[in-house]
Amino acid sequence: MDSILVKGNGELRGQIPIAGAKNACLALMPATLLSDEPLTLTNAPRLSDIRTMTQLLQSLGAEVASLQGGQVLALSSHALTDHRADYDIVRKMRASILVLGPMLARDGHAVVSLPGGCAIGARPVDLHLKALEAMGAELDLRDGYIHAKAPAGGLKGARVVFPLVSVGATENALMAATLAKGTTVLENAAREPEIVDLARCLRRMGAQIEGEGSSIMTIQGVDRLGGATHPVVTDRIELGTYMLAPAICGGEVELLGGRIELVGAFCEKLDAAGISVEETERGLRVARRNGRVKAVDVMTEPFPGFPTDLQAQMMALLCTAEGTSVLEERIFENRFMHAPELIRMGARIEVHGGTATVTGVEKLRGAPVMATDLRASVSLILAGLAAEGETIVSRVYHLDRGYERVEEKLSACGAQIRRIPG
């Protein structure tokens, strides 16, 4: 397996282009299953998770062509040959569950393996299933698979109240509702930009949707959806990750394609820590103000709060902050697996349940460390950029699931980083 070698060497300066959002693209791709007309996605990220979703859709009989070096995806589901999403593919990625709603809505039946993905707590799919049951679906869980069948005449509009905010469940219910008979109201729906992006794409395909970006969405089902061309929204998690690079190392970096509204709560914490964020004509410019970074407290929340997917990277910044910071993880359990690796680099971190207390040190030290999940992997790279000596991050296949060309983007700004083939 590949690893990444990082040498801490001072300030970063330059520009980093931000890719299309992985989490948005992974929801947009299954939307092709709702229509027999082509769907074209532009600004697509080039990631292993996208390739996994491509394999899954192709296994169902969909056509997926990667164009312009992978930045354009041309999809068509005019002739599905199968409605069974097998474990061998689904186990690789949790977003695979998003084929369930579209297949059920369009063709009335689907068999989907229970999903896999990052090892971050339980992350159950029960909210997805309850939403589909509210629309009349008959579900049977056996042998590790979800066997789903729509009632005669198809899914029916319903009032769906999510007991917890769930991005994936909102996406599955939203797609299913576009072809359901009647009106569906989603209450306590997720508000993330990726939800808004999916709704806009579905509307381009002919769906009737109101309220995206709020906690209540209303969908009037239609008889059929058509084709569309849609640009994938900017990846706010990649944006936030690279904003932390000059924050940790010093210097000044412009993030091309970045927008404040995608990372508002995150920017507030950066400002409190002593990091300057300015809008430019092409994106965002980030620089550390004079002196050492200041400690801040962070609590992860659903959008528009501080994103859980930036918690690990923020911890890397706070490891060398002046003072003590408290990070409270309120979205996923077991999401501090990067903390022991940062401790190997000299960080002072104490974890008690869903809370981590970080007491800043003057300097981290390079060390061999192991990535445990996607966001943990990049947090260790960020820590390595500011550490004395060499840091070798192993198991970076996690990294390739969510970041494209990370070593190229950072080295273009002066970082000493390279991939070591495994």
From Swiss-Prot:
Residues the entry annotates as binding phosphoenolpyruvate: 22-23
Gene Ontology terms describing biological process: cell division; cell wall organization; peptidoglycan biosynthetic process; regulation of cell shape; UDP-N-acetylgalactosamine biosynthetic process
Active-site residues (renumbered): 118 (proton donor)
MF terms in GO: UDP-N-acetylglucosamine 1-carboxyvinyltransferase activity
Binding site for UDP-N-acetyl-alpha-D-glucosamine: 94, 123-127, 309, 331
Record function comment: Cell wall formation. Adds enolpyruvyl to UDP-N-acetylglucosamine.
Cross-referenced SUPFAM superfamilies: EPT/RTPC-like (SSF55205)
Organism: Cereibacter sphaeroides (strain ATCC 17023 / DSM 158 / JCM 6121 / CCUG 31486 / LMG 2827 / NBRC 12203 / NCIMB 8253 / ATH 2.4.1.) (Rhodobacter sphaeroides)
Catalytic activity: phosphoenolpyruvate + UDP-N-acetyl-alpha-D-glucosamine = UDP-N-acetyl-3-O-(1-carboxyvinyl)-alpha-D-glucosamine + phosphate
Main location group: cytoplasm
Modified residues (2-(S-cysteinyl)pyruvic acid O-phosphothioketal): 118
Pathway entry: Cell wall biogenesis; peptidoglycan biosynthesis
Name listed for the protein in its UniProt record: UDP-N-acetylglucosamine 1-carboxyvinyltransferase
Region forming the signal peptide: none
Family: Belongs to the EPSP synthase family. MurA subfamily.
InterPro entries with a match to the protein in the record: Enolpyruvate_Tfrase_dom, Enolpyruvate_Tfrase_sf, MurA_subfamily, RNA3'P_cycl/enolpyr_Trfase_a/b, UDP_GlcNAc_COvinyl_MurA
EC number: 2.5.1.7
Keywords, sorted A to Z: Cell cycle, Cell division, Cell shape, Cell wall biogenesis/degradation, Cytoplasm, Peptidoglycan synthesis, Pyruvate, Transferase
GO cellular component: cytoplasm
Cytoplasm listed as a keyword: yes
Compartments it resides in: Cytoplasm
